[in-house]
């Protein structure tokens, strides 16, 4: 059938604390296009089918555990909403997937562990804002901790993202990513923006991986006045490609290689403070351009 538990017509479906749903076929818990229906999981959903929980226009809540080995741990369509207070483990495609006007929130105390493709993902193709918000913890050993695609797509981190792999937060195709919390990057990119998207840091990025913030293919990255990038590895901020822009208004603390690296026709602007105790405060290469309106404190090898 369509699902183990299905709700429509202002109904409630609830998987209790002792309940276990093993979904090997289609859908574990399903709201069938009804904005007044509610699905609550307090037990365990083990998804090896298509959707662990599928919410179309309704509301979903997780206080238990959702384990996704297949396509979608939780999928939201058409102005649906979902809040996670429990644990979502994703070894498949999407831990939480939000589409066209939907909102997904990982609340304080909630955990999303992503060893697959996307911990929390937003896709929008229309004019309606679609958002994923993390107030809890995201642990990423897969591709993306949080990612967004499309002009009205947005991912926001107010909690903690621990990125051990490729991307802590990524925005593409005109979407946006905002960090007001903490991103610990041991992998490739703490935050990344490309193809007309933007990534904004108002919190703290601790980079001991490759790049704290990265812009490419016309993306924009900005470290705001209250933002801190602590770089002990390769790049605090990195921008390449025509139309790419890196702006620092806050503080970049560099004890690694580069505070800012600007290349391949990209533009960098510093209005804040670059504290360089490492190799380079700023490096500009391959027709890049750098403008300094702020302060570069160099006690390392090279200021610019």
Predicted regions and their residues:
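Glycine-rich beta-solenoid repeat tracts in large extracellular/virion proteins
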Residues: 2-8, 27-34, 50-57, 72-78, ...
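Beta-strand-rich solenoid/repeat architectures in extracellular/passenger domains
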Residues: 1, 12-25, 42-49, 63-70, ...
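Beta-strand repeat architectures
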Residues: 18-19, 33, 218-219
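Short beta-strand/loop motifs in extracellular/secreted proteins, especially
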Residues: 11, 37
């Amino acid at each position: 059938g369509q699902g183990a538990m299905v709700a429509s017509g202002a109904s409630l479906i609830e998987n209790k604390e002792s309940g276990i749903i093993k979904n090997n076929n289609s859908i574990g818990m399903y709201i069938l296009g009804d904005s007044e229906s509610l699905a609550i999981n307090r037990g365990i959903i083990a998804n090896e089918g298509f959707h662990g929980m599928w919410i179309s226009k309704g509301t979903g809540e997780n206080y238990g555990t959702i384990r996704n080995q297949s396509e979608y741990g939780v999928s939201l369509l058409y102005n649906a909403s979902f809040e996670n207070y429990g644990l979502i483990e994703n070894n498949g495609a999407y831990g939480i997937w939000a589409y066209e006007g939907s909102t997904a929130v990982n609340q304080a105390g909630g955990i999303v562990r992503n060893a697959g493709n996307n911990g929390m993902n937003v896709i929008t193709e229309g004019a309606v804002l679609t958002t994923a918000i993390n107030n809890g913890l995201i642990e990423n050993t897969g591709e993306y901790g949080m990612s967004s695609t499309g002009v009205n797509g947005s991912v926001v981190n107010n909690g903690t993202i621990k990125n051990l792999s490729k991307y802590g937060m990524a925005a593409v195709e005109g979407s946006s990513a905002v960090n007001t919390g903490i991103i610990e990057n041991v992998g490739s990119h703490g935050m990344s923006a490309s193809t007309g998207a933007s990534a904004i840091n108002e919190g703290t990025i601790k980079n001991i991986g490759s790049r704290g913030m990265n812009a490419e293919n016309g993306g924009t990255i900005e470290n705001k006045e209250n933002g801190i990038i602590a770089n002990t590895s390769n790049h605090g901020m990195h921008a390449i490609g025509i139309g790419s822009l890196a702006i620092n208004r806050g503080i970049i603390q560099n004890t690694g290689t580069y505070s800012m690296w600007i290349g391949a026709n990209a533009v960098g602007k510093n209005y804040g403070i670059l504290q360089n105790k490492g190799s380079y405060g700023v490096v500009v290469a391959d027709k890049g351009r750098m403008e300094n309106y702020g302060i570069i404190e160099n006690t390392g090898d090279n200021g610019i």
